[in-house]
Regions:
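Extracellular beta-rich ligand/substrate-recognition surface
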Residues: 129-130, 415-427, 450, 489-497
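Extracellular beta-strand-rich recognition modules
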Residues: 440-446, 513-520, 546, 604
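Exoplasmic/lumenal beta-rich domain surfaces
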Residues: 460-512, 545, 560-568, 574-587
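Juxtacatalytic substrate-recognition/specificity segment
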Residues: 117-244, 248, 252-274
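Active-site-proximal alpha-helical
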Residues: 266-345
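Intrinsically disordered, low-complexity Ser/Thr/Pro-rich tracts
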Residues: 1-86, 107-110, 114, 186-196, ...
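Beta/coil-rich, acidic/histidine-enriched accessory regions frequently appended to metallopeptidases
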Residues: 21, 25, 29-31, 36-49, ...
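Solvent-exposed strand-to-loop "edge" motifs in beta-rich extracellular domains
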Residues: 297, 433, 445-451, 518-520
């Protein structure tokens, strides 16, 4: 860590006012002149055409309730769901576990033996696996005595887990593709999720983790926090949840991994998103960890505890906590990307407990003039350093909007969007009268990008006023159910562009029905979502392209949209000197110009809600005109 002094210079942009005319003083007229009555009938003004406006994107999307969904879709009967009787365990007993094979996207069953029993934990070992039993016992006892209390103090002072058992279970076995995991599915009855173990389980892969090591305890602490967070705020954004889990390792006094270094080697990594390919997530872990560590060090334990317990998600939870400081999530993010470069010990721009390397430069500017056309992810940063012999004139311009997913609706300007998030249940519903037809066909256009085999969209019909629903089969929907998340014929994965879907409604001809589109996501990772346009039922003359509004469809989580959100920018410079000077702009008009000296670092960051689409910008480095 470097010990420097920082001077923050606020910058006010003076933007030109266009098309503004200052009126001359009004002439005073003492009496109004007589206006004769016209001898003709004036032509009435035409009725104005109302142009619809997109709905605002909600802060929170509806949270899924798998029990309610199972009843509504006829998977289980209404009424109380039996829960297993809490069991008393003893060393040497055996039990069968459902375990996920992540690379193969499937569950398998295996038998394990109870090896270690403490006040709060039952540690099981998969049958036939060699393991150092003494090292396992020492690790579990150390976790119980030292690590468990530290994590509970920060993340859940009152144990929130409604245990169907007498302990928290730790499965130690061979688990392909991961070091460990926690699954919220185990909190449900097997009637609701077919692969539930019906008890709280932390899964550790002893193929890559050795009991008795810091690494084993770190992964155990990491997954234990995920368990706690599921019960405290189960629909929290994945990037926040993962940051909390890494902070659990750090707060417990365990060494943190090299993910921070991986992130700083790729600082153009979106903080607020998570890839659905686990092999690409290592820099994301680093971003989440450094951001949470920065927040914890700057605002303290109490603020961090309030953040953990906030019912809001993602940036909104930070805004809630930071409001008392007069700050926003964007303010904190802007300070953080400066801290990642300066790492100053004595100011808000650095870390006290960590010593991360500098972020990788996007480019070093060694000659001028030069113009760069670049992209940067939302809530990420590109770093440039001026290494010329003379001052330069910087000119920046960037796009003012960004898309949520597809480049445009299938037709016109408007469409519906499912929203996105973890543990989401969004619906879009409309009544239809099919009484006067003996045949009916639903047609619609869709563009979707959903976490394959984990997140699904369904098309449903109800003929009893919405009490019960049936999932309909489409051309591209699938009944494959490798992970247990597919409730019927679901759309999942990627459509590869706008596609036409067709569903037979003839079994409901002659009836009044409700049609519904429903997005249901699991508890981690989400993609752009499901977009919907141009719905038709030709047999009853129904066609809706949504260019005049909602068209009678009632959303609960779905958003009426043009697919575009405002693109924000934060441009910052660090000017070398003693002390260094930090300048910051949030431009709303382009181009932005600034004269910069050799040695100056420029940081370009983009911010837009919800989307994971990158932002485009231009940076021109030019000679300073003479006289400036």
């Amino acid at each position: 860590m470097k010990k420097v002094f920082i001077l923050l210079v606020p910058v006010v942009l003076l933007l030109p006012i266009l098309g503004c005319v200052v009126p001359s003083p009004a002439t005073v007229v003492p009496f109004a002149p007589h206006v004769p009555t016209p001898c003709f009938t004036p032509t009435p003004s035409p009725t104005p055409i109302l142009i619809p406006a997109p709905d605002p994107i909600p802060q929170e999307f509806p949270v899924r309730d798998l029990a309610e969904i199972a009843v509504r879709l006829g998977k289980i009967p209404p009424g109380p769901i039996p829960t297993p009787t809490p069991a008393l365990h003893h060393p040497g007993e055996e039990a069968i576990f459902w375990v996920v094979d992540h690379p193969a996207t499937r569950y398998f069953t295996t038998t394990a033996e109870l090896s270690v029993l403490t006040a709060n934990f039952c540690a099981w070992v998969e049958r036939g696996r060699e393991i150092d039993r003494k090292a396992l016992k020492d690790s579990i006892r150390r976790f119980e005595a030292e690590i468990y209390p530290r994590i509970m103090e920060i993340f859940s002072p009152q144990f929130p887990i409604p245990l169907n058992d007498s302990c928290i279970h730790i499965f130690n076995g061979l688990i392909p593709g991961v070091g460990g995991y926690f699954s919220g599915s185990d909190a449900y009855s097997r009637q609701i999720h077919q692969y539930s173990n019906e008890k709280p389980v932390l899964y550790l892969n002893i193929g890559s983790l050795k009991p008795g090591t810091e690494h084993y305890l770190s992964v155990l602490a990491h997954e234990f926090q995920h368990m706690l967070q599921w019960y405290v705020d189960r629909n929290e954004d994945t990037w926040v949840n993962e940051g909390f889990s890494q902070m659990a390792e750090f707060i417990a006094g365990l060494s943190y991994n090299g993910s921070a270094r991986a992130f700083l080697a790729q600082p153009d990594t979106q903080l607020t998103s998570w890839p659905d390919d686990p092999g690409k997530a290592y820099p994301n872990y680093g971003a989440s960890f450094l951001f949470m560590a920065y927040f914890y060090e700057r605002f303290g334990k109490e603020a961090f505890q309030n953040l953990v317990r906030s019912p809001l998600n993602g940036p909104h939870s930070f805004n809630e906590i930071l409001a008392s400081q007069g700050l926003s999530f964007e303010d904190l993010f802007a300070d953080w990307v400066i801290a990642n470069y300066l790492d100053d010990l004595d100011s808000k721009y650095g870390y006290r407990e960590l010593d991360p390397p500098k972020p990788q430069l996007t480019a070093a500017i060694t000659f001028i003039p030069i113009t760069l056309t670049e992209t940067v992810h939302q809530y990420a940063a590109d770093y440039f350093k001026i290494q010329t012999e003379e001052p330069v004139l910087l000119r920046f311009s960037g796009n003012l909007t960004v898309t949520l997913g597809p480049q445009s609706p299938y037709s016109g300007k408007f469409m519906w969007w499912s929203g996105r998030g973890d543990e989401v249940d969004s619906t879009l519903t409309r009544p239809f009268n099919l009484k006067n037809t003996n045949k009916a066909t639903l047609r619609f256009r869709t563009w979707y990008d959903l976490e394959k085999d984990y997140d699904y969209v369904y098309v449903e019909v109800s003929s009893d006023g919405g009490n019960t629903w049936k999932i309909l089969r489409g051309i591209r929907s699938s009944e494959d159910n490798p992970i247990g998340n597919n409730l019927g014929y679901g759309y999942t994965g990627k459509s590869g562009g706008w596609v036409e879907e067709e569903i037979d409604l003839t079994p409901w001809a002659g009836k009044e029905i409700l049609l519904r589109f429903e997005l249901i996501t699991d508890d981690a990772v989400n993609n752009p979502g499901f977009f919907l346009d141009d719905i038709a039922i030709p047999e009853i003359g129904y066609y809706e392209d949504f260019e005049r509004g909602h068209g009678g469809w009632v959303p609960n989580g779905f958003v009426y949209t043009d697919g575009i959100v405002k693109q924000g920018w934060i441009i910052q410079v660090i000017e070398s000197g003693k002390p260094p000077v930090v300048r910051r702009w949030k431009p709303v008009d382009f181009p932005l110009e600034a004269k910069l000296n050799p040695g100056t670092v420029i940081i370009v960051s983009a911010f837009a809600p919800v989307t994971s689409e990158p932002a485009f910008y231009n940076l021109a480095f030019m000679h300073v005109p003479s006289g400036q």
